């Protein structure tokens, strides 16, 4: 390429779009941090002994247009056929108003988990709608705000049954008509919790005492039967019963809660969320009020704010890993908020009558097919069904299956049977096509007329729903597109996202989610594919996944990858399972001690507990590094039982520890494995790598380093990379392996496959040099923020040369002792300045951890630093007595528009200082919609359902 052509090329254009500071801004920032160049700063920050010796070997960077063209070539390899496989995944129509205004809207998908409720009331309301929807359709007393998928929800339900039950048994009963992928994930979880799983006919549920049982309703092959007596008998035998159910079926069927179930789980996928070759989708869990504090997952509750007005928040957070660590009953990272919101909006848009029509249509078409099959001499495995039939096809099975394939139709193949599942997209033409395949001579409309006289004949009377559902006004109001559009916009406007400003959350990497990366997610070639279609029909996904794995291996220094885990915590779990299986394969299954530094993220000990490891905490020294003497002592004490160490690099204290290689060598010498948490991978890419450092396994947070958006609290992805000796122990899957020996951790083989294009696109457009530059700029931005704030706030930890990694910790404890102003006061006051708070009290209580990422430019960094410096000035006014501790802009923060309207203002500071504390806020103001939320009130007066419509009035 000539020099002129090269200078005009768009090949590397995306790198400059993704990274915030341009060359001129970088020069200014380098001067502030007193570094001669960007490379000089990196040399002072990253230990020389772990720096990569050569650049990563990745394909040259692509322009946005070239990337999309390449992505389209992947998509075209996927074959879209009419699919009636069912098994927990169904075609659905995503209402266009939801597709465009939620799924494709950065106002919804770039928000963070609603830890800060004052700037999250919109999605909190939508998630509360989700909980109400689940509670109504399942007839249960409390529901959570989503889990990862139906299979992992079943595994969580098993753990709940063991925690909450009174049985001393070690047995968990699983009915043999539960979805096979669910059974496999339950088996994996049980194997490392020491539970025995018995898969048997539902009629044998009381042959042995079990602490819990899992039933499917309707069954995986479609059978609808009344479970009331079966559940009662099991409960009389001290067995807590979980029922996996279908939300659309629950519109017409008697809900599992009315049959006596203790726990109800399932997937909300068919409520407007594309199949996406397996995900992401929102699972649900509902239970009895008695079990609410042992239920996993986020729970949205109704509380009040400082003015006594209704305010929503995440309730019962004391169950979570960030507080209870290895004793946690829930991992707050494990959720699918964006998909739960889509499902909730689907229910709001259709309402109970719309859902009833959809359910009746799917059932009626199924009944027509059943009648036609019976007329043609076929035998149905079950006479009672909702939308799924199992047809006894015997010797004809293969021929009929192939005939369907020739007609571009996918059926579910079972031993001597074919399965057919209908959904809201099924048409009369589909039924006629199946009539042709099965040689049915009947006429569809004639059969329809006959069935209409007894429309629900295929549903036993005892299984027909009589109770009302979705009676709250929110589900009975927004049914025109105009109403729906305005309701969703009303909620969106309440929330702070990356569309408003920087979200400087430490350990969260809230970087740009570029539009080009997001575009392929909603292409039908990726979205409309069932995860269990024949492999040849998913060749595009296979090629994309394989190429992404190779890219990730090059970036991480690992030898193999699994893309199956649906979240970072799920990836941690899969990694520890791989380690334990490796030890078992060597006859060292007794190795069960996991060393975890005291600075570790709460998911680490919580995940170790999930594989029955004994957590031993390693101290950190005064500089925030692993205490090498204490580490040596712990290794020596536990060397015969040492399984692993879980470390994060750079450490959760925001520094590159000099002795990380020595840590790995010490653990290896004692027979242990090194798990390197990938949470801070954004400070490694292109400069070092987990494999080069010496670790054996890591999960990567694709929703951090590799640009999958956080979605307001999910989806995420946590693929794991391993060295070659652990590769045989990566999670398998029932569709691609032998049932019972695959150790699956998710319902689908590629987990949340439809968001993999996001990370592939990011890597492809950045190239090796762009990725390394992003890491360097993340480090520059963090050090710039640190240097600007250092004269005003204590910086808790810095590395060997006074540098931080990609984040820094501001120590508020001395200020609190001196003035009474807390880290929470500062976090809430930042909202008045137009910012989301940094991470509060992690990894050290009484601190704020700031991670600016590479995507923020100098102006935004300065706006943030100026805000914190101004807040320090406000703290000084409290210190000097100008403002009393009990009444100042910090303790009353955040301020709302309602504060401006108050007739009486008796505070010692002006309304302007309260609401417009900076020049930026006068020009462009983001308004919190409630005052500070009362967390204690919310937990003491727990309400997790939609409140009266009157309370929604502004």
Curated annotation (Swiss-Prot):
Enzyme Commission numbers on file? 1.4.4.2
Source organism superkingdom: Bacteria
Q: Which gene encodes it?
A: gcvP
In this record, what's one Pfam family? GDC-P
**Has UniProt tagged this entry with the keyword Oxidoreductase?**
yes
Give the keywords, sorted: Oxidoreductase, Pyridoxal phosphate
Q: What class of enzyme is it?
A: oxidoreductase
* Protein name as annotated: Glycine dehydrogenase (decarboxylating)
Q: Which GO terms describe its molecular function?
A: glycine binding; glycine dehydrogenase (decarboxylating) activity; pyridoxal phosphate binding
- InterPro entries recorded for this chain? GcvP, GDC-P_C, GDC-P_N, GDC_P, PyrdxlP-dep_Trfase, PyrdxlP-dep_Trfase_major, PyrdxlP-dep_Trfase_small
Please give the start and end residues of each transmembrane region. Answer: none
Q: What does this protein do?
A: The glycine cleavage system catalyzes the degradation of glycine. The P protein binds the alpha-amino group of glycine through its pyridoxal phosphate cofactor; CO(2) is released and the remaining methylamine moiety is then transferred to the lipoamide cofactor of the H protein.
GO terms under cellular component: cytosol; glycine cleavage complex
- Which of the residues bear the PTM N6-(pyridoxal phosphate)lysine? 704
Cofactor(s) needed, names only, are: pyridoxal 5'-phosphate
GO biological process entries: glycine decarboxylation via glycine cleavage system
According to UniProt, the reaction catalysed is: N(6)-[(R)-lipoyl]-L-lysyl-[glycine-cleavage complex H protein] + glycine + H(+) = N(6)-[(R)-S(8)-aminomethyldihydrolipoyl]-L-lysyl-[glycine-cleavage complex H protein] + CO2
Q: Does the record carry Oxidoreductase as a key word?
A: yes
How the protein assembles, per its UniProt entry? The glycine cleavage system is composed of four proteins: P, T, L and H.
Organism listed in the record = Vibrio cholerae serotype O1 (strain ATCC 39541 / Classical Ogawa 395 / O395)
Belongs to which family?
Belongs to the GcvP family.
